[in-house]
């Protein structure tokens, strides 16, 4: 899915200026990237708030329009208000199509309900990590990774090597020879 966001350069900075922006329905943010100076920006709160609720937005390549120029960016960080449903600040990183990007991708459990551990042993599959750090070209970043649990039995521990990574995507930990546990299977052993 492609997301497009309109941004404007903000001149005034600081706490007071940020509060005024938020009252006007804008979010203060920053755009940075390799080979460019950081730019203080403002984006529409409603657009970003509802986009952040979608899991795919966090790993998507976003078209950010700034002063008539469109840049490819990814969301690098954002801050939420402690108790209001309000985005306080957002960071965008400009990316180039030919440069690798390091990003955390959500992990989904699939086929667990068909596994022996769940069907016959009354068990369940529990994620130890909800995301995996990967390196990929911006166009190859997946929205999420699937952890296939069709063949698991009670007592199994699933590792990074059990995840089928799409072509052009590499796990940062596996590149360092660290095959971390990502999920456990509980239930009654027979």
Curated annotation (Swiss-Prot):
Keywords: Ribonucleoprotein, Ribosomal protein, RNA-binding, rRNA-binding
Gene Ontology CC, one term: cytosolic large ribosomal subunit
InterPro entries recorded: Rbsml_bL25/Gln-tRNA_synth_N, Ribosomal_bL25/Gln-tRNA_synth, Ribosomal_bL25_b-dom, Ribosomal_bL25_C, Ribosomal_bL25_long, Ribosomal_bL25_short, Ribosomal_L25_dom, Ribosomal_uL5_bac-type
Pfam families attached to this UniProt entry: Ribosomal_L25p, Ribosomal_TL5_C
Domain of life: Bacteria
An example Gene Ontology biological process: translation
GO molecular function: 5S rRNA binding; structural constituent of ribosome
Summary of the function given for this chain in its UniProt record: This is one of the proteins that binds to the 5S RNA in the ribosome where it forms part of the central protuberance.
Subunit composition and interactions: Part of the 50S ribosomal subunit; part of the 5S rRNA/L5/L18/L25 subcomplex. Contacts the 5S rRNA. Binds to the 5S rRNA independently of L5 and L18.
Xref: HAMAP family: Ribosomal_bL25, Ribosomal_bL25_CTC
Family: Belongs to the bacterial ribosomal protein bL25 family. CTC subfamily.
Protein name in the entry: Large ribosomal subunit protein bL25
Taxonomic source organism: Neisseria meningitidis serogroup B (strain ATCC BAA-335 / MC58)
